[in-house]
Amino acid sequence: MAALAWLGAEHTLALGLTPVGVADAGYYRMRMAAPPLPPASADLGPFWEPSLDRLIALKPDLILMDSWSALDRATFERVAPVLPIPAYPRDASGWSFAAGQLSDLGRRLNRESVAQAALAEAERRIEALRARAQAAGAPPVYVALLAQTGRNATLYGGSGLVGGALERLGLPNAWRGPFSPSGSAVVGLDALAGEPDAVVLAIDLATTSGSFARATTGNALWRLLPSVRKRRVAALGRFYPHGGLASLLAFAEQAATAVEAARG
């Protein structure tokens, strides 16, 4: 099969299968924390314009595509059957949705026993991470991607991956305002002063080439934030807010480690 959706690629790998090709495979390898994408998976080109010729040459028996994709589904159905992969719904539990989606795909691909084993292991891991987070005092957490100007930040939470992980960890989201349907909110940087004892998980992706450093270097407002002054900041080097259960667990691991470090 081939994956034009990273969420689909992640689920496929979690089921012990290797997609013959993945859209933006190079960026996937840089940004996704788990599972690793094997070298055998070809790069199909960018999300918005995957190479149809390359896809045809790979002869996939199934194509996984984001349900919200602007790509012409009929074009790809001439290559192989297309299975839409839905995004996180607005009002669903992030954990339940990701787990249910993995289970459903396992049935679809005749990997149900593998899916059930993966779900059992995921449950074991999240409970262990919850115990660590609670032992560290369960402080409120901001999950923030700073704009390069250093004046604004995109915060994550809501019903998606981040919200699902924080809920299972028992960590309050420090941002109490509304989130978009995709689980994000754009705020002024001063909003991160709302919870003085919060831990800030600052997204610092390899794919953005040092934008975090540019946003914070010489930034007086950043230095004045209570969490920064108290050294309660940790970097998220790999983060994809629309990933599946493996991404959720990878984020939960980073969050638990960060709150432990903040406790000292």
Please provide the spans of the model-predicted regions.
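Short helix-initiation/N-cap motifs at beta->coil->alpha
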Residues: 44-52, 179-189
